[in-house]
């Protein structure tokens, strides 16, 4: 499942 918002871990 691909999320609409690209989350950046950090």
Curated annotation (Swiss-Prot):
Keywords: Amidation, Hormone, Pyrrolidone carboxylic acid, Secreted
Protein family membership: Belongs to the GnRH family.
InterPro entries listed in its UniProt record: GnRH (IPR002012)
Keyword Cell membrane included in the entry's annotation: no
Modification type Pyrrolidone carboxylic acid: residues: 1
Modified residues (Glycine amide): 10
Entry GO terms, CC: extracellular region
Location in the cell: Secreted
Name of protein: Gonadoliberin-3
GO molecular function, a single term: hormone activity
Function: Stimulates the secretion of gonadotropins; it stimulates the secretion of both luteinizing and follicle-stimulating hormones.
Organism lineage: Eukaryota, Metazoa, Chordata, Craniata, Vertebrata
Pfam families: GnRH (PF00446)
Predominant location category: secreted
